[in-house]
A protein has these predicted regions:
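Conserved short histidine dyad/triad with adjacent acidic residue
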Residues: 35-36, 49-66
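A cytosolic small-molecule/anion-sensing beta-strand core signal
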Residues: 75-76, 91-92, 110
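Structural motif
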Residues: 78-80, 87, 103, 113
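Short, charged/polar surface micro-motifs in flexible loops or helix N-caps
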Residues: 46-48, 56-59, 78, 121
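Short acidic-glycine-tyrosine-enriched beta hairpin
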Residues: 85-100
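Ligand-binding loop in jelly-roll beta-barrel domains
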Residues: 100-121
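A short, N-terminal "cap"/entry segment at the start of jelly-roll beta-barrel domains
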Residues: 1-47, 82
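Short, conserved beta-strand element in jelly-roll/cupin
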Residues: 54-56, 65-81
Length: 121
């Protein structure tokens, strides 16, 4: 995970599937679905979002601009990150940094699960 402790405020939201005081694996929280990309919000507030995504092989996200600085954590499988016109293969255990407004796309070359920590301004 990108952080070990998060300060909470009344308007913060932690996904109710994640129970305080219990051990869990991020990779197990979001399922694969045939031919689809599955998304689950883990936590968010007005300054950050933590999102999990599971991509079936061959699926992906079209090119778009990052709304803020972001860190991608490859939890399972393999993908290609197209970033500012250059392809970057990524596999489980590796990470990738996106600058705010950078154009990028994601394409799963095998089944692929990722966590994304997005810093909002």
């Amino acid at each position: 995970m990108a952080y070990t402790e998060a300060l909470t405020r009344k308007d913060d939201l932690m996904n109710e599937r994640i129970k305080a005081g219990e051990v869990f694996k991020l990779v197990d929280l979001v399922p694969y679905a045939e031919g689809k990309v599955v998304k689950m919000d883990v936590a968010h507030n007005d300054k950050m979002k933590c999102i999990l995504m599971a991509f079936d092989e061959g699926t992906g996200l079209p090119e778009h601009a990052a709304p803020g600085e972001a860190l991608l954590f490859d939890l399972d499988g393999e993908a290609v990150i197209s970033y500012e016109g250059k392809d970057h293969p990524i596999k489980a255990g590796e990470n990738f940094h996106f600058a705010k407004a950078a154009l990028h796309a994601v394409k799963a070359t095998k089944k692929f699960k990722m966590a994304l920590l997005l810093i909002l301004e």
